[in-house]
């Protein structure tokens, strides 16, 4: 019985907590945001507008990378970029 109470309390404490993730945020067409010119300020602003902790321009891919994005924000995992498709 004590274990049940302990598990119930643990579930209540973790309910509603929001976890965060890192990754390349996506536009509507499954394309990541580019940062030509390695514009870290642009990427940081973009990421913070998406409720992330911070962001920067990843030079190897020339794409914006965000730290601490909310779970409901889509990130690049797989699939092709489909420019112009809504």
Swiss-Prot record:
Positions bearing Proline amide: 83
Keywords for the protein's UniProt record, in alphabetical order: Amidation, Disulfide bond, Ion channel impairing toxin, Neurotoxin, Secreted, Signal, Toxin, Voltage-gated sodium channel impairing toxin
SUPFAM superfamilies noted in UniProt: Scorpion toxin-like
GO process terms (BP): defense response
Superkingdom field: Eukaryota
Molecular functions (GO terms): sodium channel inhibitor activity; toxin activity
Tissue specificity: Expressed by the venom gland.
Record GO cellular component, one term: extracellular region
Protein localization: Secreted
Domain LCN-type CS-alpha/beta: 21-82
Disulfide pattern: 31-81, 35-57, 43-64, 47-66
Alphabetized CDD domains for the sequence: neurotoxins_LC_scorpion (cd23106)
Free-text comment about domains: Has the structural arrangement of an alpha-helix connected to antiparallel beta-sheets by disulfide bonds (CS-alpha/beta).
Family: Belongs to the long (4 C-C) scorpion toxin superfamily. Sodium channel inhibitor family. Alpha subfamily.
Function statement: Alpha toxins bind voltage-independently at site-3 of sodium channels (Nav) and inhibit the inactivation of the activated channels, thereby blocking neuronal transmission.
Protein name: Toxin Tpa4
Naturally occurring in which organism (per UniProt): Tityus pachyurus
């Amino acid at each position: 019985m004590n274990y049940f109470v302990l598990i119930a309390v643990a579930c209540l404490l973790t309910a509603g907590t929001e976890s965060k993730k890192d990754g390349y945020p996506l536009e509507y067409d499954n394309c990541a945001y580019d940062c030509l010119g390695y514009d870290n300020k642009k990427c940081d602003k973009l990421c913070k507008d998406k409720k992330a902790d911070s962001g920067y321009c990843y030079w190897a891919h020339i794409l914006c990378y965000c730290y601490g994005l909310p779970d409901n924000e889509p990130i690049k995992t797989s699939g092709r970029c489909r420019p112009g498709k809504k």
